[in-house]
């Protein structure tokens, strides 16, 4: 329980008491022994105690007040007093309650303060040491402010004080120079102009504090770390050669500051140490966090206000980094703090600069993942990251792609593991990160695309022209021949109701295996409802919820987007869609960009249908499709129509197509009945009757669904629930020509099996 140093100190105290024939072992004996204990001695030094004076006072008190054993009683030994025993017990209890295993000399020193009536506690108070000072040092390494300079003008801080300052730096900062020496920092590639400006600012006489401002991921922290790396390598001007960069850990600085003034004391001591070491530079990452850090509720004294006086005088040098958003929203509002820094804009590097950066970092990643990156793979990582990963910036997102490609290669089974990462591997990683199809079309995808048109024509009848336009646009995009900054395709499907405009898009999403994002435009007829697509502006209800359209595309960037019955929407919706069709992006109310470059945009409309249904004059049927297109031109503005890839007119369904529709509905019904164990047979006469009954040129295929429901599904429902088809069976549907109605033959599963056996 007691550590070895404390046991040695206690043994020395008993030996001293026996040597002087003292009758009792007192708390003063204990404190005198602790002056030689490393742990207790360090705590007392941190509290600025004059150890020599304290030792003299203790020795004098012990000699004057402690009873001495008579020479005649040689057998009697020195006995510890009750107060001595209580001090050790309290130290043990205190350590146990804090979850530690060993009692140190510093813990015993804390316990001495509980013996208020003892001379030892009095002498500690006399030297301006409180129990809280010792506890703070044990828990957090907090030292009392060092006393003013000694009356002796030639006195210099001793080595112990210097060691205390170094320890304080180690507790609350990270030495980036030391980290660079052991290989913990990647080398800085490029950024010569920014680094040169930062060094110039650091060498100024006053206000020598550079502030690196840029978007997240552009390499602000890398510049500060790279400066430390170059100092270690000796690749800096002479005036910077002896500098050491410390990175501030604001979390450690705040941790454990329970009482008012703890944080200020700790931070002031750190600043004083930096001020004394003229070659030290403090790097504060996310420097906007110091505004308000350590401030009590309602108080104005925070880390920013504590550091301001030293910043303008040039006594300490600070490098800060923050983003444009935090700089304008938080940092710049404290004008007094902002003027003490020299803003340096860190812009996003170009593609060529990023390639150079990754080539410089490549050996580190190759050694870590045990792979090799080809030159084409590095360039592909940068170019694809720029093209498809829009929520981050170079070089960070390109480095992420390289790193993840190496990790993916490393995690492959040994039999499939490759030693080289090529362009195809990079494409696969980018496709997973951005949730888009791979640039290189696989064999399975190639088969899907080849048979896409035929598959859609088997599911949607009579609209071959529309299907061909859709599939050709998708094939061009997957072949890499589409517009780089536009959606895969932007189509307006026009035509009468019930002919398959919506069904084509539904079947397209199923065939490609991608998400269908469907928006019914009848919900956006009012002007104020348009904001729901991109999010409400600040001050309005729903501002924090984002936009329905932008959120859906951000979540599913590779999808089929269906805007159903677009003519019912407010005209402002058309204006929102202009930039989507032209530039492939849409910004929501929070500034997030939704990427539509891998979206198939389909809009449906019934505009112009009324013109096609006008009665013809005379015996010849007139083609009114030209009038229908004129109606579409009236509703949709020229700039809207000009951005569409195609306006596809869906024709009325012919009688031949209706027979195919009947067959499709019967197949769908059979699939439902298969789950019940029921087989369905419909004669050709019955199919012809259903086609004749359900055909309506103006209404399309929707009346057919109602005819199937009334004439097939309703009679089957009662038999499935209460009749002969409860346990399965067979249904035969035929036509009674005399009555001109359908007849139904139901056969239970058991009877069907018996007849089959005979």
From Swiss-Prot:
Q: List the GO molecular function terms.
A: ATP binding; ATP hydrolysis activity; ATP-dependent peptidase activity
The GO biological-process annotations, alphabetized, read as: cellular response to heat; protein quality control for misfolded or incompletely synthesized proteins; protein unfolding; proteolysis; response to oxidative stress
Provide GO CC annotations from the record: cytoplasm; cytosol; endopeptidase Clp complex
Spans annotated as Disordered: 140-167
Domain named Clp R: residues: 1-145
Q: How does it assemble?
A: Component of the ClpAP complex composed of six ClpA subunits assembled into a hexameric ring in the presence of ATP, and fourteen ClpP subunits arranged in two heptameric rings. Binds to ClpS.
Family stated for the protein in its record: Belongs to the ClpA/ClpB family.
Question: What protein does this entry describe?
Answer: ATP-dependent Clp protease ATP-binding subunit ClpA
What species is this protein from?
Escherichia coli (strain K12)
């Amino acid at each position: 329980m007691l550590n070895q140093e404390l046991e040695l100190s206690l043994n020395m105290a008993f030996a001293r008491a026996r040597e002087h024939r003292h009758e009792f072992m007192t708390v003063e004996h204990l404190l005198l022994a602790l002056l030689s204990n490393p742990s207790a001695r360090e705590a007392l030094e941190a509290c600025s105690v004059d150890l020599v004076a304290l030792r003299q006072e203790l020795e004098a008190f012990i000699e004057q007040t402690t009873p001495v054993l008579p020479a005649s009683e040689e057998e009697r030994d020195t006995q510890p007093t009750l107060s001595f025993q209580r001090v050790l017990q309290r130290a043990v209890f205190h350590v146990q309650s804090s979850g530690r295993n060993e009692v140190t000399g510093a813990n015993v020193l804390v316990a001495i303060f509980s013996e208020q009536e003892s001379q030892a506690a009095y002498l500690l108070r006399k030297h301006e040491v409180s129990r809280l000072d010792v506890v703070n040092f044990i828990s957090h390494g907090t030292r009392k402010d060092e006393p003013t300079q000694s009356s002796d003008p030639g006195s210099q801080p001793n080595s112990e004080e210097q060691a205390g300052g170094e320890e304080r730096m180690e507790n609350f900062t990270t030495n980036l120079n030391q980290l660079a020496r052991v290989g913990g920092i990647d080398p800085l590639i490029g950024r010569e102009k920014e680094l040169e400006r930062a060094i110039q600012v650091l060498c100024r006489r006053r206000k020598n504090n550079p502030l690196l401002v840029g978007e997240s991921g552009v390499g602000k922290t890398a510049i500060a770390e790279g400066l430390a790396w170059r100092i270690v390598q000796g690749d800096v001007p002479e005036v910077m050669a002896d500098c050491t960069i410390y990175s501030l850990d604001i979390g450690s600085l705040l941790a454990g500051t329970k009482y008012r003034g703890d944080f200020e004391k700790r931070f002031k001591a750190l600043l004083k140490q930096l001020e004394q070491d003229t070659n030290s530079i403090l790097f504060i990452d996310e420097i906007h966090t110091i505004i308000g850090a350590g401030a009590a509720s309602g108080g104005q004294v925070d880390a920013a206000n504590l550091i301001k006086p030293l910043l303008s005088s040039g006594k300490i040098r600070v490098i800060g980094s923050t983003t444009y958003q935090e700089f304008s929203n938080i940092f710049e509002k404290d004008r007094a703090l902002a003027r003490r820094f020299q803003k340096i804009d860190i812009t996003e590097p170009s593609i060529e600069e990023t390639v150079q950066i990754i080539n410089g970092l490549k050996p580190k990643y190759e050694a870590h993942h045990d792979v090799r990156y080809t030159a084409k793979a590095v360039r592909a990582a940068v170019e694809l990251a720029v093209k498809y990963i829009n929520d981050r910036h170079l070089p960070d997102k390109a480095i992420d792609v390289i790193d993840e490609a190496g990790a993916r290669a490393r995690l492959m089974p040994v039999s499939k593991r490759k030693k080289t990462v090529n362009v195809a591997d990079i494409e696969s990683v980018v496709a997973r990160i951005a949730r888009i199809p791979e640039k290189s079309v696989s064999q399975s995808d190639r088969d899907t695309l080849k048979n896409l048109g035929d598959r859609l024509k088997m599911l949607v009848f009579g609209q071959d022209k529309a299907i061909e336009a859709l599939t050709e646009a998708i094939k061009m995009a997957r072949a890499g021949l589409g517009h780089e900054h536009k959606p895969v395709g932007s189509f307006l499907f026009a035509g009468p109701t019930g002919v398959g405009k919506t069904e084509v898009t539904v079947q397209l999403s199923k065939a490609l295996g991608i998400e269908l994002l469907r928006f019914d435009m009848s919900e956006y007829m009012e002007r104020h409802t348009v904001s729901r697509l991109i999010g409400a502006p600040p001050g309005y209800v729903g501002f924090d919820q984002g936009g329905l359209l932008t959120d859906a595309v951000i979540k599913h960037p590779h999808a089929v987007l269906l805007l159903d019955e677009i003519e019912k929407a407010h005209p402002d919706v058309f204006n929102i869609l202009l930039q989507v069709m032209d530039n492939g992006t849409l910004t929501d109310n929070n500034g997030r960009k939704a990427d539509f470059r891998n979206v198939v945009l389909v809009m449906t409309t019934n505009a112009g249908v009324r013109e096609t249904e006008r009665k013809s004059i005379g015996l010849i049927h007139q083609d009114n499709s030209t009038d229908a297109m004129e109606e579409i031109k009236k509703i949709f503005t020229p700039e809207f129509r000009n951005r569409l890839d195609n306006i596809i007119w869906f024709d009325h369904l012919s009688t031949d197509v209706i027979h195919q529709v009947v067959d499709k509905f019967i197949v769908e019904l059979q699939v439902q009945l298969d789950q019940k164990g029921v087989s369905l047979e419909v004669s050709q006469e019955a199919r012809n009757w259903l086609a004749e009954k359900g055909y309506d040129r103006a209404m399309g295929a929707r009346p057919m669904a109602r005819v199937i429901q009334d004439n097939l599904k309703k009679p089957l429902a009662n038999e499935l629930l209460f009749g002969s088809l409860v346990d399965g069976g067979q249904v035969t549907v035929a036509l009674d020509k005399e009555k001109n109605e359908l007849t139904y033959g139901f056969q239970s599963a058991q009877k069907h099996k018996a007849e089959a056996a005979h």
